[in-house]
């Protein structure tokens, strides 16, 4: 099979066996660097917004780290555009969890800009319906009230302004 197909198979197997491989115990054995990242994100000594850069979108980087975060109590930011209107598309059970967002080469330019403005807490730069949804959750995102972690790849590494990022 092709390399991309093998990557998808590996990610599916990781997700299926998340308890074994992506728990803190599994990471201690199979991914100690990922475990340290998880500990840093969960450490109350490091409050506020976190930025994670990786050259890798799938296996070695953002893809696996996304699975690790989901396995360990984080939720992925989900936004959608229906009939031209941007809105949060988070599952009810994910509200209140720490949230991570992706800023990579797989999102549209518009989606990346909306994500960046959510991370920055610049509600006035967002479409009014989405801004109203966010204001009902928090006044801003200065300390990660909406999105705690932004994961970027090289597509997000140049020419963007991020506010209040501490780690």
What residue spans do the PLM features occupy?
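A short beta-strand element within the Helicase C-terminal
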Residues: 161-167
């Amino acid at each position: 099979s092709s390399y991309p197909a093998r990557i998808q198979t590996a990610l599916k197997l990781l997700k299926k066996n998340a308890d074994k491989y992506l728990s803190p115990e599994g990471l201690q054995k199979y991914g100690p660097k990922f475990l340290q990242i998880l500990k840093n994100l969960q450490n109350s000594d490091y409050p506020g917004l976190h930025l994670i850069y990786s050259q890798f979108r799938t296996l070695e980087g953002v893809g696996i780290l996304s699975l690790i975060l989901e396995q360990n109590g984080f939720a992925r930011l989900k936004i959608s555009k229906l009939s031209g209107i941007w809105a949060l598309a988070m599952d009810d059970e994910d509200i209140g969890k720490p949230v991570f967002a992706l800023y990579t080469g797989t999102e549209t330019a518009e989606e990346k800009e909306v994500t960046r403005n959510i991370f920055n807490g610049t509600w006035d730069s967002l479409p009014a319906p989405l801004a109203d949804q966010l204001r009902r959750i928090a006044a801003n995102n200065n300390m990660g009230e909406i999105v705690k972690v932004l994961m970027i790849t090289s597509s997000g590494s140049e020419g963007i302004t991020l506010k209040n990022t501490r780690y």
